[in-house]
């Protein structure tokens, strides 16, 4: 058995070895969403807090009487709760604020213990070390293993130790995740999402982008691209997709990434790790093929569909890391290679949501597909311009 600390190191690809703490979900076969949720549980599951929007992800994550979330051998696992469709981000922010408040109480009690005469010197050293490293997840895990037996042994004699023992669940730095689909994130819950990232708090938002309201039957959302047939866009959507990620970068202090696991597993893993490590709000937009897309190859090929989407330019991979700007580097990193644009139309025709336009509205299909390709090229060229900007020169001035 591989030791979890070894697996967690950068020398290993942890997602290949760590035990998933999200398993056997009731999602559709080939669902493009669940691999991302599973990966996050492998990386941070033993200290993960999840605020889940209502939608597909809440159904397969919490259908009574079962849940795919589980625990490791120590009894640690994700803490999951579901909120309404429109306020999932605020719900997650509330979790984070409550956690901050309780940890601030821990700091207060530990400082009082350090200043008192009731605690031995070795206790005070460990308390001081925890205060100095309270935002370091791995260090707090290590220190929690020392602190818990110490305070449990002394709690009957020392009131400070008793208070710390009562708050021991807050010793390890938690990883706060907010999970929802594109309907919740781009549309109904967008105001809340914007409010939460503007707060500057250390939360991680995962948008499972299926480009439709999946759970309610495939209605059009602001994430639905030009030309796709969906409910409320029966003749093919006529306006371009909202660029939620690029909008979030305008704050300048939000970590943002667009990922597609089937296209680039390394980039997906790197983006998720960077987002969680970033000491502020992060937004990850993950491309997720859905049964509503009508993949002609079948949902068993959903990972391959993600790869095709990136290669033809339908979906783009990039990361925006504000920490790089502090080093005088360009925070925007374009991870997609130059697309094979000649494959773009073929990709559209491989999904029923686009192919249906050709059957039902042949006169308009060519125009819509051309517009979809032009929009994709326009967006990719915009990303290329952002990636080329000379941040070193700006910093030197």
Q: Predicted regions: what is each one?
A:
Residues 9-161:
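Iron-sulfur-cluster electron-transfer modules
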Residues 156-158, 172-178, 187-204, 208-338:
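Glycine-rich ThDP/TPP pyrophosphate-binding loop and its adjacent helix/strand module
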Residues 73-132, 288-397:
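Flexible, low-complexity linker and terminal segments
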Residues 20, 46-51, 56-59, 175-177, ...:
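Beta-sheet entry/capping signal
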């Amino acid at each position: 058995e591989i030791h979890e600390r070894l697996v967690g190191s950068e020398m290993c690809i942890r997602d290949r070895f760590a035990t998933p703490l999200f398993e056997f979900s009731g999602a559709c076969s080939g669902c493009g969403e669940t691999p991302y949720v599973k990966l996050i549980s492998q990386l941070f599951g033993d200290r993960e807090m999840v605020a889940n929007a209502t939608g597909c992800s809440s159904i397969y994550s919490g259908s009574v009487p079962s849940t795919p979330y589980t625990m490791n051998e120590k009894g640690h696992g994700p803490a999951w709760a579901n909120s309404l469709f429109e306020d999932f981000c605020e719900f997650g922010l509330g979790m984070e604020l409550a956690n901050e408040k309780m940890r601030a109480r821990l700091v207060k009690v530990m400082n009082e213990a350090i200043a008192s005469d009731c605690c031995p010197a070795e206790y005070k050293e460990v308390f001081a070390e925890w205060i100095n490293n309270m935002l370091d997840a791995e260090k707090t895990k290590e220190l929690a293993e020392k602190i818990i037996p110490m305070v449990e042994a002394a709690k009957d004699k020392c009131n400070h130790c008793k208070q710390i023992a009562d708050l021991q669940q807050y010793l390890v730095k938690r990883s706060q995740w907010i999970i929802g689909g594109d309907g919740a994130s781009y549309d109904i819950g967008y105001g809340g999402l914007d409010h939460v990232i503007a707060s500057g708090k250390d939360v991680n938002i995962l948008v499972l982008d299926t480009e439709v309201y999946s759970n309610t039957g495939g209605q059009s959302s602001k994430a639905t691209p030009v030309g796709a047939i969906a409910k409320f866009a029966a003749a093919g959507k006529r306006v371009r997709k909202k660029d939620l990620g690029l909008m979030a970068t305008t704050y300048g202090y939000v970590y943002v990434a667009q990922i597609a696991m089937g296209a680039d597993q390394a980039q997906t893993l790197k983006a998720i790790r960077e987002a969680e490590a970033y000491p502020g709000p992060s937004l990850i937009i993950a491309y997720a093929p859905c049964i509503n897309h009508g993949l002609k190859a079948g949902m068993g090929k959903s990972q391959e569909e993600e790869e095709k989407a990136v290669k033809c330019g339908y979906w783009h991979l990039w990361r925006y890391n504000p920490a790089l700007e502090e080093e005088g580097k360009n925070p925007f990193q374009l991870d997609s290679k130059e697309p094979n644009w000649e494959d773009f139309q073929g990709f559209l025709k491989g999904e029923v949501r686009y192919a249906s336009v050709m059957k039902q509205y042949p006169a308009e299909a060519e125009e819509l597909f051309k517009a979809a390709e032009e929009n994709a090229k326009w967006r990719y060229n915009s990303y290329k311009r952002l990636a080329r900007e000379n941040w070193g020169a700006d910093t030197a001035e």
